[in-house]
């Protein structure tokens, strides 16, 4: 399996409306206010983004019970973005194309975004802390040491923790690029999914999987799908390496075209249970909304599990 080169580079998100005032900060989920914030992407049956809907078109359900919407807006909100890049041996001939796509994503994002880079193989390394300097991001992405195995889950978990500790923006996004199944992480998929749901981080994944290794590819796809779907992001599996640029642009558009929806749960009990969340859309052509699948109702939003420490080099 490819060793993951931890390269998390910032994703720019939020939806731009012409001549709008500077966006306000997003509401934050806290145990006292119990405000749950959702970032929802809406697409029609052809997969095209739908960006002109009003609040009346949306309904939010928690465990099947409709919730009153407290905040609804669509703005180009700067994000805290991480690029997590596989740097295992099998990525050696793919890195240059992947790096170019990652930089294109950053350039297509909000200029006020903050971005960091994580490269990973057997271990994950924070090669560039938060920055808005495209040259520094380019240098960190170029730290190629393609060898060893793949610790994708640990790289993503480390990146989630880094976002929680260091991000100055409320909206948080990760892009993971890997070409193989995780074979070196200490953390489990279950705990990673929990962390993603609790952190409000949108996770996008690009899997450059080898179809000749079908069993390995299926395992890798299952993990990438799980973390992307749980967080409200999306996973992509290009058939050709040349498609990565197009996917990066698509991810940028997705992030910048999302609705911000927040509600105060009717059920205020902090019992640690999982609360399933669904956003339903009533509009012509039957569009559908994609957002995180739920959250855990506990003041301590971090699952109690061993976490990989942030490593610098």
For the regions a protein language model found, what residue spans apply to each?
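Bacterial N-terminal signal peptides that target proteins for export
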Residues: 1-11
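Hydrophobic h-region of N-terminal signal peptides that target proteins for export
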Residues: 10-20
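Scaffold/interface architecture of coatomer-like assemblies
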Residues: 19-313
């Amino acid at each position: 399996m490819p060793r993951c080169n931890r390269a998390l580079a910032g994703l720019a998100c939020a939806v731009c409306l012409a001549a709008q005032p500077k966006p306000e900060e997003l509401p934050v989920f806290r145990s006292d206010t119990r405000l749950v914030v959702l970032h929802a992407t809406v697409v029609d049956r052809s997969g095209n983004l739908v960006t002109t809907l009003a609040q009346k078109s949306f309904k939010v359900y928690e465990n099947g019970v409709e919730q009153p919407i407290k905040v609804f807006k669509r703005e180009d909100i700067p994000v805290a973005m991480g690029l997590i890049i596989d740097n295992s041996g099998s990525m050696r001939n793919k890195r240059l194309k992947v790096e170019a796509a990652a930089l294109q994503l950053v350039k297509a994002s909000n200029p006020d975004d903050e971005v960091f880079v994580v490269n990973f193989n057997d271990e994950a390394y924070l090669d560039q802390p938060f920055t808005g300097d495209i040259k520094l991001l380019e240098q960190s992405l170029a730290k190629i040491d393609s060898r060893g195995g793949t610790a994708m889950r640990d790289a993503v978990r480390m990146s989630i923790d880094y976002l929680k500790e260091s991000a100055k923006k409320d909206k948080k996004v990760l892009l993971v690029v890997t070409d193989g199944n995780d074979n070196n992480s200490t953390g489990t998929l279950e705990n990673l999914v929990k962390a993603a749901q609790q952190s409000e981080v949108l996770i996008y994944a690009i899997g450059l999987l080898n179809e000749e290794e079908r069993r390995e590819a299926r395992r890798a796809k299952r993990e990438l799908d799980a973390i992307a779907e749980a967080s409200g992001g999306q996973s992509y599996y290009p058939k050709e390496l040349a498609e990565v640029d197009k996917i990066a642009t698509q991810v940028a558009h997705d992030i910048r075209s999302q609705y911000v929806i927040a509600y105060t749960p009717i059920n205020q009990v902090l019992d640690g249970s999982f609360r399933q969340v669904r956003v339903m859309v009533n509009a012509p052509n039957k569009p559908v909304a994609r957002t995180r699948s739920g959250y855990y109702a506990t003041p301590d939003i971090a699952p109690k599990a061993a976490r990989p420490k942030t490593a610098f080099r």
